[in-house]
């Protein structure tokens, strides 16, 4: 399939699917090379703990996903292999990290600002029997 040549070993109907697979494998290879080009310690030093957790989880998920694909290519049903439970466990941790990230992004209440906003937003109608501004300083005694 390299160089766009047609191979007679498989039906023509699956040519597009095989080409897409080959392209995807190339993309995965490129990403892994990029990821492996920087030492893990060097990468993690630049990140805060939450980002470090994300990198570790994505790395573990990627590795286990690739093992899932490997098992499938070897004729082993990955759904019946312990790798399935491992992927589910990693997903649980990914969801926890996502919840933490979402909580950090959520709007926080500034009580002082909210109090000022409510106080200034309330409208008080003028009473009919209130003295004029000119009479404000004078008393009726």
Curated annotation (Swiss-Prot):
One of its GO terms (molecular function) is DNA binding. The keyword Repressor applies. It is found in: Nucleus; Cytoplasm; Nucleus, Nucleolus. Residues 1-100 are annotated as: Required for transcriptional repression. One of its GO terms (biological process) is maturation of 5.8S rRNA. Plays a role in the recruitment of the RNA exosome complex to pre-rRNA to mediate the 3'-5' end processing of the 5.8S rRNA; this function may include MPHOSPH6. Can activate PRKDC not only in the presence of linear DNA but also in the presence of supercoiled DNA. Can induce apoptosis in a p53/TP53 dependent manner. May regulate the TRAX/TSN complex formation. Potentiates transcriptional repression by NR1D1 and THRB. Residues 100-141 are annotated as: Interaction with NCOR1 and NCOR2. InterPro entries: Exosome-assoc_fac/DNA_repair, Sas10/Utp3/C1D. Residues 50-100 are annotated as: Interaction with NR1D1. This is Nuclear nucleic acid-binding protein C1D. Belongs to the C1D family. The lineage of its organism: Eukaryota, Metazoa, Chordata, Craniata, Vertebrata. Phosphorylated by PRKDC. There is a cross-link at residues 119, 126 (Glycyl lysine isopeptide (Lys-Gly) (interchain with G-Cter in SUMO2)). Keywords: Apoptosis, Cytoplasm, DNA-binding, Isopeptide bond, Nucleus, Phosphoprotein, Repressor, RNA-binding, rRNA processing, Transcription, Transcription regulation, Ubl conjugation. GO terms for cellular component: cytoplasm; exosome (RNase complex); nucleolus. Monomer and homodimer. Interacts with NR1D1, THRA, THRB, NCOR1 and NCOR2. Associates with the RNA exosome complex. Interacts with EXOSC10; the interaction probably mediates the association with the nuclear form of the RNA exosome. The homodimeric form interacts with TSNAX following gamma-radiation. Interacts with RAC3. Associates with the RNA exosome complex.
